[in-house]
């Protein structure tokens, strides 16, 4: 498994980043920038469901604005996360493949989360872990949802404005 920093992109290496990005923060931007540096093309799947704190379409638009080199796709579903459930894994893989925007791949899956190795293996891709300990950008979306006012400095301007208007 690779660890960031990553070597410069090579032609025709499509990458995948998956997350809720609820809300997107500077740690997510660090991850996406690392994926864009490593891969020729990057698809970003924004998992979206009815219980999310920020609307999925808005999170998708923010990420597309902040990372114009990525193809950002909202994936609306009600799937839970259970890494021991084979049938559920298959549903996740079917969902991801159905939305894949490129002719082949992914060849690389980038994440800061532990599931990256298994997801990459199941997709036949290389797992790339980026700042798993969150030392480079010490923040998580959970921390922001719990105490938004304390972490406004970890949000890009459009996200910060929305959080201030809607959560504070």
Task: Label the predicted regions.
Residues 2-168:
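Nucleotidyltransferase catalytic core that binds NTPs
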